[in-house]
Regions:
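Conserved helicase RecA-like core
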Residues: 2-386
Length: 386
């Protein structure tokens, strides 16, 4: 699959024909010039084309669909016109904040609708005239099934992290939402950092003559992110190596990934007991506690966060300079999502993969698939620039 051949690239936001009020929001939010995905995708979606868009993590996918979809909202109609489906509450909240900030000079009403939050508040907000809704499939389907969230005025349907949204976990929920029905004029966009063949096949059934903006996997660059590995003979040596890294590196903010809740909690308890300040977050935690801990990390009050793949996708924490994979992810697609947390928006970043023998096959698979080479971690960690 290749990108469409006739895509016009816009070097500035001013060239895109965006409303002045939207441009003010874009610039006040801190954007200066479009990223590659923004330069290629905003105008086609704004002008009524379906989009299949791929760009690696941290390149501005969220702003791409927020900007283009806001252009399609009829400000005189106080009904839902944009629906954005995402896999996690944290990602929904992030997109909601981006939409609010970019649209700050527009009279656009936005709603973040996810499980764990009051559905009464969601219903009230929609009845008051919400125009853009971002949420997780379960809550969105519930609101649609109650005939509270209706689609007759829907201009845009967006699936973010499409590779995850169209896999088994969410596939049925997403299909139920689609089966409720959207007008033929509703434009659909799928965005993700990775586009496995299976997902492209499903996407082709959902999209009408889409503009394809695809970066092949071997070109999904992790430029600016130095990738190291430590190969160990025994699993139980991992903790000691992690402590050595912790002691020697001057870390601004770091994410440490484990594959399961149990493993994350074990590691967090062990590090805390040994005097290392950090927090742990996972999908089975109470929503209020997850939000609290995420805010602590995002604000910089907590510098190290241990996580499962809950945070691998789409969470924008600007000052993360180091990602440590205490365990390699169980699928190669999550590798790029994980280490994309460092080196956001062109900043330098570093990832360290702590490996035991049973992870060698996955390491080789990742290196081959993404055409990368993980370097041996130098003994002198002072040579690593974060």
């Amino acid at each position: 699959m290749e990108s469409s051949s006739d895509i016009k690239i816009y070097e500035t936001f001013d060239e895109m024909g965006l409303p002045d009020t939207l441009l003010r929001g874009i610039y006040s939010y801190g954007y200066e010039k479009p990223s590659k995905i923004q330069s290629m995708a905003i105008v086609p979606f704004k002008e009524g084309n379906d989009i299949l868009g791929q760009a690696n993590s941290g390149t501005g996918k969220t702003a791409t669909f927020c900007i283009s979809s806001m252009c399609r909202i009829d400000l005189t109609i106080k009904k839902p016109q944009v629906m954005i489906l995402v896999p996690t509450q944290e990602l929904a909240k992030q997109i909601y904040e981006v939409a609010k900030n970019i649209g700050v000079y527009l009279p656009v009403s936005c709603l973040c609708a996810t499980g764990g939050m009051s559905i009464r508040d969601d219903i009230h907000a929609i009845q008051q005239g919400v125009q853009l809704v971002v949420g997780t499939p379960g809550r969105i389907y519930d609101l649609m099934n109650r005939n509270i969230l209706t689609t007759e005025n829907m201009k845009c349907l967006i699936l973010d992290e499409a590779d995850q949204m169209l896999e088994d976990r969410f596939y049925k929920q997403v299909m139920c939402i689609l089966e409720i029905g959207f007008p033929n004029t509703t434009r659909v966009a799928l965005f993700s950092a990775t586009m496995p063949k299976e997902v492209i096949e499903v996407a082709n059934k959902l999209l009408q003559n889409p503009v394809r903006i695809l970066i092949p996997p071997e070109k999904v660059t992790l430029e600016g992110i130095k990738q190291y590995m430590v190969q160990l003979d025994k699993e139980e040596w991992k903790y000691e190596v992690l402590c050595d890294i912790y002691k020697q590196l001057n870390i601004n903010q770091a994410l440490i990934y484990c594959n399961t809740r149990k493993r994350s909690e074990w590691l967090a308890d062990k590090l805390s007991t040994d005097g290392y300040p950090l927090m742990c977050i996972h999908g089975e935690m109470e929503n209020s506690e997850r939000r609290k801990r995420m805010e602590e990390f995002r604000s910089g009050r907590v510098r190290v966060l241990i996580s499962t793949d809950l945070l691998a996708r789409g969470i924008d924490v600007q000052h993360v300079s180091l990602v440590i994979n205490f365990e390699l992810p169980m699928n190669r697609e999550n590798y790029i999502h994980r280490i994309g947390r460092s080196g956001r928006f062109g900043k330098k970043g570093c990832s360290i993969n702590i490996l035991c023998p049973n992870e060698t096959k996955m390491k080789d698979d990742i290196e081959k698939f993404y055409s990368i080479v993980m370097e041996e971690l130098p003994l002198d960690l002072g040579s690593i620039v974060l």
